[in-house]
Amino acid sequence: MNQILSLAGTPAASPLGYYSWAFGQAARDPFYIMVVIYIFFPYFSAVVVGDPVRGQSLIGYINASVGFVLAATILFLGAIADTVGRRKPWILVTYGTIAIGGFLLWWVKPGSEGLSLYSSVGLIFIIMVAFAYAEVFHNAMLPSITPAERAGEVSGLAYALGNFGAVSMMVFVLFAFALPGVQDWPFLPEQPLLGIDHSLNEHDRI
């Protein structure tokens, strides 16, 4: 029986292994779409900071700081990802940091009710660094687990699943939390699920 080799020339993982890798991106990408692009960052800028210009400036400083940290450490991380055999513990740590940080975003509120502004900035910074590190270790797994002839298929599947997961999550949040109580459409619940209160911007923080 011929052994199937990966792009790295090592024995490829089973289909369960490389398809699980693809679904890993489906779990990660919705966070970026929901938090960074469409919902939380605009909420942070306009509501928490209270000044969209200053808010965007703070987000710019966060992104610049994350970029500096990555520039200083990414080569070392890449070397670790390429030379250390076990990458899953690193993925567990980075994904766990993202999950815990995402949970704590619930307490990012305007005024003095939740985390302070600079605590919120620090939390977002940590999450964004963890997200970037998660990408490094996740992407580094592809050459060693995927059969060489299926690398494009698996990579494309991961990209598609990531986008599908992000769009699905966006639609769910819209129809479960954001639109009920605002739009009088017959197929919507009368009130947001889980008792979400729009006046407290809970639909932006959930």
Protein language model features and the residues they cover:
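Glycine-rich segments within core transmembrane alpha-helices of 12-TM secondary carriers
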Residues: 155-177
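Cytoplasmic membrane-interface "Motif A"-like loop-to-helix N-cap segments
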Residues: 81-97
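Central cavity-lining transmembrane alpha-helices of secondary-active solute carriers
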Residues: 59-79, 100, 170
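A membrane-interface helix-boundary motif in multi-pass transporters
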Residues: 52-55, 87, 175-206
